[in-house]
């Protein structure tokens, strides 16, 4: 994968991250449904909805690259992947569910076991990295 191809992929994801951030804030303003996962950490319907938005877009633009996501437990079985996406749809769920600003939406692209690109969006602060 060339640098130009990687740049295009990241550019294609920016609007999706902005949309996911908007939806995360809308869901939070309406009141989140919260649960505790088997690892004793919180998860909300916001986490799951953002995960769905991000993974659906990534599957469309890079269908041959597997996705490993915190909120999709059945996709962590292959420990020998060279190329994959690593996603944390809401990093900082505790802050997210408690109406604090310190949470982000994250995705990183790993090629040949090396990080080559990533996006981090802080919706409450409207900051993209």
Where are the predicted features?
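N-terminal subdomain of lithium-sensitive/metallo-dependent phosphomonoesterases centered on the IMPase/IPPase/PAP
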Residues: 1-90
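DPxDG-like acidic metal-binding loop motif
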Residues: 79-129
